[in-house]
């Protein structure tokens, strides 16, 4: 209901929720059409994906049967490390179980992200020419292609 007043002014509303599966996240998933599952390229992050997948299934059962998973987005990713490669393989297996995909785009580990957060600016304002800004652009393009068909 909160978005209804402004819905006609926007094509999309992006709800960035905390990683904890609390009331805010459940409410956001209830209101959403699509969900992107972010996963850091570390050993424990995919455990969170499993928990979120269970929550998504419950949301589909009880409040939002049309909720779709757009894909899994790997973050803090470094393709040169063996752990990132292992996490990518595990994410691919998990995506197959969830009937979704791992995005071709990924977000690299970069100090500039922390700097932008510290000064409370989006990466596109703080460092629009950075490699990580390119990562986000590539991800947005891939996401929009998937959503819009």
Where are these predicted regions, by residue range?
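PAPS-dependent sulfation machinery
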Residues: 1
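Conserved catalytic-core segment of NTP-binding enzymes
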Residues: 4-108
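Phenylalanine-focused residue identity feature
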Residues: 98, 103, 124, 138-139
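Short, glycine-rich, amphipathic interfacial segments at transmembrane boundaries or analogous
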Residues: 109-115
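C-terminal boundary of histidine-terminating zinc-finger modules
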Residues: 116-134
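Histidine-centered active-site loop/cap adjacent to the catalytic His
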Residues: 128-149
């Amino acid at each position: 209901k909160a978005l209804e007043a402004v819905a006609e002014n926007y094509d999309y509303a992006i709800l960035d929720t905390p990683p904890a599966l609390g009331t805010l996240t459940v409410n956001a998933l209830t209101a959403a059409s699509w969900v992107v599952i972010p996963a850091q390229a570390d050993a424990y992050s995919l455990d969170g994906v499993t928990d979120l997948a269970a929550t998504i299934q419950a949301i589909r059962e009880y409040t939002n049967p049309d909720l779709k998973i757009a894909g899994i987005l790997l973050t803090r990713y470094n393709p040169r490390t063996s752990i990132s490669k292992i996490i990518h393989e595990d994410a691919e297996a998990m995506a197959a179980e969830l009937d979704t995909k791992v995005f071709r785009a990924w977000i690299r580990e970069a100090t500039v992200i922390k700097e932008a957060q510290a000064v409370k600016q989006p990466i596109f304002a703080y460092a629009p020419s950075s490699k990580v800004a390119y990562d986000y652009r590539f991800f947005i393009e891939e996401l929009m292609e998937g959503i819009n068909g």
